Amino acid sequence: MAENHVALLLTPEGWKLLSSLPPYDPSEALSLGRSLREEGHSPALVAAALTQQRLRERAAAKFGPFAQQMLFTADGLEQATRLTVSAHHAARYAAAGVTKVADLGCGIGGDAVALAGLDLPVLAVDRDEAAAALATINLMPFPHASVECADALEIDLVERGVDAVFADPARRAEGRRITDPEQWSPALSQVLALRETVPALGVKVAPGIDHAALPADAHTQWVSVDGDVVEAAIWCGPLAPEGPGRSALILRSGAQGTTACTLVDPSTTDPSQPPIQLDPI
């Protein structure tokens, strides 16, 4: 959804209209749009509201019932961390006893929501105005969370009282996936350098990242959700109680909710070394 469509929804009329819509039903979308225009709403506002209604329906797979109170863009939703995964991220910060987390490259605020949901004060930062606006809306239920539209690397973390960081560098440009970590925005090396100021650092990275790009003194964990490998994350300092190495977090959905198990690679304490390839039997 274009930025001007997001702006339309942030007006009193736009928010009221969006809040009045029923759950998305593709068989009713055309007739609903026609009815809303006949009521006097502008075509642009109707299009924005119906697009958001459809995005919320898609977002339920990642955010469950919380999606109905959030705002999304198509790109933001695609890149957002699933709530089941971000909850595990947030648990690391809570267990480490940190007092304020900076979510750098927060996007629509998915990870910041999980952190704030554990009563952790959060400073969410994104340089994209539309993303920052959506994160502001999505974090409204949490008075201990704030959002800034700024370059993540220009934030003075010490001055802001931040003692932990979660970073999600942009890994796409013009719709194309970027595989070189030094071409991410910001570059992986720039993000890892934040450890000199804030040792408690977590970085979301692509699951297919070259092992040579992983810091040898950190713990890297790959995450699988219902059989799909969705991400990897680098955990540093107090956020890595396992110590240097690598592991896999496996999440499975079922009738009793989500179950989790962790598999640790016992063969190495250096995640920058590629896994041993076993000969086929």
Predicted features by range, described:
Residues A135-T136:
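Conserved SAM-binding loop
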Residues A2-P23, F166, R171-I281:
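Class I S-adenosyl-L-methionine
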Residues M1-T99:
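S-adenosyl-L-methionine
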Residues P121-D126:
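Conserved SAM-binding motif I beta-strand of class I
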Residues E154-R160:
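Short conserved loop adjoining the S-adenosyl-L-methionine
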Residues G97-G107:
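Conserved class I S-adenosyl-L-methionine
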